[in-house]
């Protein structure tokens, strides 16, 4: 058993014998069931720094979305010396560390693909280095090049037609959450020692492929840990030993996260479940009288300020998929422990309070791990913050905890992972709506008119027959699932080989569990299309080649989103059927296959490449996002819509089920207290049914329309909304995506 003087006052034994942050938390945290009255406002330092950062953000917006970009230096742990928000204010920064040498400057990260790194530069008027081009073209292979070299013609065709899209073959896969708390609790030297022991115990026998690879990966992890120490030294800190107080705990933890974002540009770079962990240090300092509540809030405000600054250089096709510059610095608060104790601490309040001290913001992606058993005061405070800022998402702790335990993090938008124990292979989405059209048209793509899918016999009847369509759809789904898994196996193999996440994996157990994430797009449209074929009459409209390019519906049919089992059961069937098809395939590195119903803002891109559907959706128009009902389908109010989504079993979609709802303020009540109370009741009822996720927006469409027409108004500079799986500044969306958000249902009644 090891012991450090920095651990004075901390209880427990197991976490001192092995790397076990959960045990440390359970033995030392202080549940809080009071209200928010203890919270402190922003300090003068916070106001000055946030004011300086807002000026930089305004300048960034004026320059078209990018303030500055690196073109000569490849990002690494030690590529840069120290950087600050404002050199003249650097002594005010309680938490330090930038991705590059300047605030909001985007790093050059070519290992995912030199073409992408260069295109990101030229898109915004920057000229990339000719020398780096030669190095990463002639001498060093990148992830992107390796993937495309190995793709089959069928894979390329599926990618081109967007029946599979958004794949992490042109960007870092992300979704790996290092247990950044370990840096604070143990210090880097102890973590190196633990990894060296793993290395010594790996490969004492036959040198198989797996053993050789693991030894190399552990060696890279140890090197990354050493690099983290050098990175911190540039800022004058020695992180070799554990943190001795709250400020060091916040700083050490942030350095761990900074190492990740300096070396990877993953689509999701989550922070993880840190609030209750940090509260232990803050509470110890408060009890000892060496920290005030105002100083504690300042630490959290400054840490969150850093999360709000995370930026990556992206290409236009990426921005179409993931609009508004998200990084998914997802950070969780709340939850209930396995022993039944609430894990709400004062620090959970402090993180939510940053949205009041510094205003709404998309990052970090604040996530409440919700249960109706959470303290009432905390539920009401979270609901109040949601109503005021539309910046918070909620996930059902009661359905996730039996699967992931009580120390999981959200590793992207809505997907859970056991902190420090697991990693996830991110896999984008398959277009199940386009797949239905392939089933009808015999694998011919309705947009390109090319044979993309297998050359099965098309449906040629004038009116679609459910008993004919369904088996053909199942057959085509099975083809798509097989191709999809093969594509992802190839991508994940190449990412491990050419763009391995050693900084993050250094903070995860060596004996790591892996999940293989897949996803579904067009979910509600498939449900309603099959329902229309089954319960109404759907006539196929064909072009001169016989291809079905449109549909006429005669009669009415049950629609998903109205608490009608006839439609909702089709959704349950679709989810289960697709997951079973995925699960029967071989997945890379013995990973466990999961799926999600989640689209991000790629619902617009998917729709743009998908023809008219039998549910009445027009050709090449946006899909409904995530697990949301189709636009205009919801006729029975918010609660009926929520009930439909709640019927989807979480255990068949362990990668997450995203549901985004917009509620007119008057629908919730006519006073702040009434609205807060009603929102809590809505969420209690929704999550008690076993539903997984809810994005809450509280505003009317008039505000969206005004923000779209007058983005220059000061009130809209930080106007934040929740979209499928994340939050975004509304004025940072493209006009097309703004119109998509405006077209969604805004519930005027519960």
Segments predicted by a language model, with ranges:
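Conserved catalytic cores of very large enzyme subunits
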Residues: 2-750
């Amino acid at each position: 058993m090891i012991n450090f003087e920095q651990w004075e006052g901390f209880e427990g034994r197991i976490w001192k014998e092995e790397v076990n942050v959960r045990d440390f938390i359970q033995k030392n945290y202080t549940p809080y069931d009071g209200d928010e009255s203890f919270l402190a406002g922003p300090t003068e330092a916070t106001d000055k720094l946030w004011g300086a950062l807002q000026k930089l953000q305004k300048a960034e917006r004026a320059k078209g979305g990018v303030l500055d970009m690196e073109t000569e230096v490849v990002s690494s742990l030690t590529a840069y010396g120290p950087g600050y928000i404002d050199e003249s204010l650097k002594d005010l920064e309680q938490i330090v560390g930038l991705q590059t040498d300047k605030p909001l400057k985007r790093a050059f990260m070519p290992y995912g693909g030199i073409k992408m790194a260069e295109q990101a530069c030229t898109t915004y008027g920057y000229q990339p280095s000719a020398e780096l081009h030669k190095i990463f073209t002639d001498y060093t292979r990148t992830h992107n090049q390796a993937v495309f070299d190995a793709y089959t013609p069928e894979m390329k065709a599926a990618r081109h037609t967007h029946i599979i899209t958004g794949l992490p073959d042109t960007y870092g896969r992300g979704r790996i959450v290092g247990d950044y708390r370990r840096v604070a609790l143990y210090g880097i030297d102890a973590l190196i020692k633990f990894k060296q022991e793993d290395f010594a115990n790996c490969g004492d026998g036959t040198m198989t492929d797996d053993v050789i690879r693991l030894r190399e990966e552990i060696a890279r992890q140890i090197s990354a840990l050493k690099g983290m120490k050098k990175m911190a030294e540039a800022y004058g800190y020695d992180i070799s030993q554990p943190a001795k107080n709250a400020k060091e705990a916040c700083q050490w933890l942030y350095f761990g996260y900074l190492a990740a974002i300096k070396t990877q540009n993953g689509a999701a770079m989550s922070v993880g479940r840190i609030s209750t962990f940090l509260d232990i240090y803050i509470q110890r300092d408060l009890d000892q009288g060496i920290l005030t509540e105002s100083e504690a809030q300042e630490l959290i405000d400054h840490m969150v300020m850093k999360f709000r600054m995370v930026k990556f250089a992206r290409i236009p096709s990426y921005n179409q998929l993931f609009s508004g510059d998200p990084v998914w610095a997802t950070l969780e608060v709340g939850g209930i422990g396995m022993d039944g104790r609430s894990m709400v601490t004062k620090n959970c309040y402090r993180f939510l309070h940053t949205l009041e001290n510094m205003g709404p913001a998309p990052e970090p992606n604040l996530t409440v791990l919700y249960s109706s058993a959470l303290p009432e005061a905390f539920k009401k405070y979270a609901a109040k913050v949601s109503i005021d800022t539309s910046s918070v998402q909620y996930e059902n702790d009661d359905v996730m905890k039996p699967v992931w335990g009580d120390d999981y993090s959200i590793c992207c938008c809505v997907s859970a992972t056991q902190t420090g124990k697991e990693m996830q292979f991110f896999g984008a989405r398959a277009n199940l709506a386009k797949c239905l059209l392939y089933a009808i048209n015999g694998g011919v793509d309705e947009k390109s008119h090319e044979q993309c899918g297998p050359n099965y016999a098309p449906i040629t009847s004038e009116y679609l027959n459910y008993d004919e369509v369904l088996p053909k759809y199942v057959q085509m789904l099975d083809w798509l699932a097989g191709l999809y898994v093969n594509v992802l196996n190839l991508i994940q193999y190449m990412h491990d080989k050419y763009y391995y996440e050693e900084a993050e994996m250094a903070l995860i157990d060596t004996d790591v569990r892996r999940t293989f994430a897949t996803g579904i797009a067009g979910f509600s449209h498939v449900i309603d299309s099959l329902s229309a074929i089954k319960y109404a009459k759907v006539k196929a409209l064909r072009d001169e080649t016989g291809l079905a390019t449109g549909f006429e519906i005669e009669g009415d049919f049950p629609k998903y989103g109205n608490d009608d089992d006839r439609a909702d059961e089709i959704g349950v069937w679709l989810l289960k059927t697709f997951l079973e098809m995925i699960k029967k395939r071989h997945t890379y590195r013995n990973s466990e296959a999961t799926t999600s119903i989640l689209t991000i803002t790629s619902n617009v891109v998917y729709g743009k490449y998908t023809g008219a559907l039998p549910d009445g959706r027009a050709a090449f128009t946006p899909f409904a996002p995530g697990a949301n009902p189709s636009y205009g389908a919801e006729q029975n109010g918010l609660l009926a819509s929520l009930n439909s989504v709640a019927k989807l079993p979480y255990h068949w979609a362990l990668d997450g089920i995203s549901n985004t709802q917009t509620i007119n303020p008057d629908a919730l009540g006519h006073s702040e207290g009434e609205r807060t109370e009603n929102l809590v009741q809505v969420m209690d009822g929704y999550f008690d049914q076993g539903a997984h996720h809810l994005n809450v927006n509280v505003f009317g469409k008039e505000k969206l329309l005004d923000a779209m027409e007058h983005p220059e108004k000061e009130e809209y500079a930080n106007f934040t909304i929740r979209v499928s799986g994340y939050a975004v500044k509304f004025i940072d969306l493209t006009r097309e995506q703004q119109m998509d958000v405006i077209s969604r249902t805004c519930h005027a009644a519960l």
